[in-house]
Regions:
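Flexible loop/N-cap segments at domain edges
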Residues: 171
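Terminal RNA-binding accessory module
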Residues: 1-43, 47, 329, 336-337, ...
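Rossmann-like S-adenosyl-L-methionine
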Residues: 191-452
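C-terminal lobe
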Residues: 181-190
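Structural signature of eukaryotic scaffold interfaces centered on beta-propeller domains
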Residues: 174-176
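Short, conserved phosphate/pyrophosphate- and ester-handling motifs at nucleotide-, phospho-/glycolipid
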Residues: 11, 136, 259
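Extended interfacial segments that mediate partner engagement and assembly in macromolecular machines
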Residues: 31-43, 49-158, 178, 193
């Protein structure tokens, strides 16, 4: 039986207390470290243990990359049942620190009634008061300290999750790595803050890089950070940044990769796998704001993107127009519906890129993709387990796994991305005369599909 023990490293000799036993594995707690592993290093963060963000700050980066590579391999072997996996070396990050361009800090009351702001402890909503985070740029630290000072002077109330009272809920910040622009967003349980002019003054003095200060109004009893309504206190409610030579406008609500440098590495690998020559139709399913597809649009004859969130589709359309991309269209709808509608209207994309959420693809999506018979499918995954499950169906639908590359988008954390190249076993022909299993697609609703 495997025993998972947080805070340990491969090669440690230690005393462990088993605290929870399940059917196939157990959880333990480190009681005493007898002999440290050669992979161990001194954590560079004072709250590395209790904070729920990083889990690998106590080991070397080389060891972290080995763990993440093995995690992908284990999932493909154990869940997918694959052997002789064509794994390529993991794409490690050039830096383990200061790589995040977004930060959201929950706000609460300490036992002595003062504001605390930071990150949630492991598996809880208990806030660990934090004045710096090594994953985020130093400019966020300065903005957070100015915000703390303003709260003390203004006396603005702190949100109480249990009572659903008080005003200040989160401090949410974004920055453009290339543009240098900074957006500060105060998430509030109400439309008005005490001392708004003072807040603007203190933030601008502490952080000259700030280009916008907004209030996000969230009056709901919810764990969702942002509400729908924004009010601008100063400047503009968006920032700009450049990714793969394209410029994107980013609002508090917009999806944008939090590690721009590694996002470019991932997109470049996806483009390499796509193998575009300029003659192909490219379908980008789960396209979000269009970043992956738009980064490849200049190498394709035609780009079609599909996304379920209307605001994201609108952002994708704006991003295409802003970057003078004229060979793209975007559909708003569920991936299953979008794939089926595109199939029925006769679209037979040569290359399909899919970047689904953590839950992976609906089985009907994979069935329709297989019916379209693209020569290549590029699968970008944020969860090795659902990736393995979906690849199992793809191989059953006449696709081969040609290459697998893990990508470390979030150094220090447990997360790992993966890019997979799938090729059709018989690339000639484009699905004419194929019959799709209607039982897998019976829920398709054309009325929910629309062009953006």
């Amino acid at each position: 039986m495997a025993v998972f023990v947080p805070g340990t490293a491969v090669g440690d000799r230690c005393v462990v207390r088993v605290v929870k036993v399940l059917k196939k594995y157990a959880f333990g707690r480190l009681e005493e470290l007898l002999t440290p592993s050669p992979d161990r290093t001194t954590p560079d963060c004072s709250i590395a243990g209790p904070c729920g963000g990083c889990v690998y700050r106590h080991i070397t980066y080389e060891a972290e990359l080995k763990i993440k590579t093995q995690r992908v391999r284990d999932a493909l072997e154990r869940i997918g049942g694959f052997e002789n996996i064509p794994m390529e070396p993991i794409l490690g990050a050039p830096s383990r620190t200061r790589y995040r361009n977004k930060c959201q800090l929950p706000i609460g009351l300490s036992k002595n009634g003062e504001m605390q702001m930071g990150f949630y402890a492991v598996n809880s909503h208990r806030i660990i008061d934090t004045h710096t985070c090594l994953l985020q740029p130093e400019v966020f630290d300065r903005a957070a300290e100015a915000f703390r000072a303003w709260q003390k002077l203004s006396g603005e109330s702190i949100y109480d999750e249990a009572a659903h009272s008080g005003v200040l809920r989160h401090l949410y910040m974004r920055c453009g790595e290339k543009s240098g622009e900074v957006l500060v967003c105060i998430v509030a349980n109400g439309a008005k803050l005490h001392g708004e002019d003072l807040l603007v003054k203190m933030l601008r003095e502490a952080v000259p890089e700030i280009t916008g200060i907004v209030v996000n109004i969230n009056r709901e009893r919810t764990n969702v950070v942002l509400g729908r309504e924004l009010r601008t206190l100063w400047g503009k409610p968006t920032i700009r940044d450049t990714l793969c030579r394209l410029e994107f406008e980013i609002s508090p609500h917009a999806f944008y990769q939090v590690n721009r440098t590694q996002a470019e590495a991932l997109y470049n690998k996806a483009a390499e796998y796509a193998g575009l020559t300029g003659a192909e139709t490219l379908l980008d399913l789960y396209c979000g704001t269009g970043t992956i597809g738009l980064s490849m649009a200049s190498r394709a004859k035609k780009l079609i993107g599909a996304e379920i969130i209307p605001s994201a589709v609108e952002n994708a359309r704006k991003n295409a127009a802003h970057n003078h991309v004229t060979n793209a269209e975007f559909l708003c709808g569920d991936a299953k519906d979008a794939a089926r509608i595109l199939y029925e209207r006769g679209e037979r994309p040569d290359i399909i890129v899919i970047d689904p959420p953590r839950k992976g693809c609906d089985a009907a999506v994979i069935t329709t993709i297989a019916a379209m018979r693209p020569t290549r499918v590029v699968y970008v995954s944020c969860d090795p387990a659902t990736l393995a499950r979906d690849l199992k169906q793809f191989t059953a639908e006449n696709y081969n796994i040609e290459a697998v590359t893990p990508v470390d988008m979030f150094p220090g954390t447990a997360h790992v991305e993966t890019v997979v190249l799938l090729s059709h076993k018989k690339p000639d022909g484009h699905g004419e005369g194929l019959v799709i299993n209607e039982s897998n697609l019976e829920d398709t609703d054309k009325s929910r599909m629309k062009k953006a």
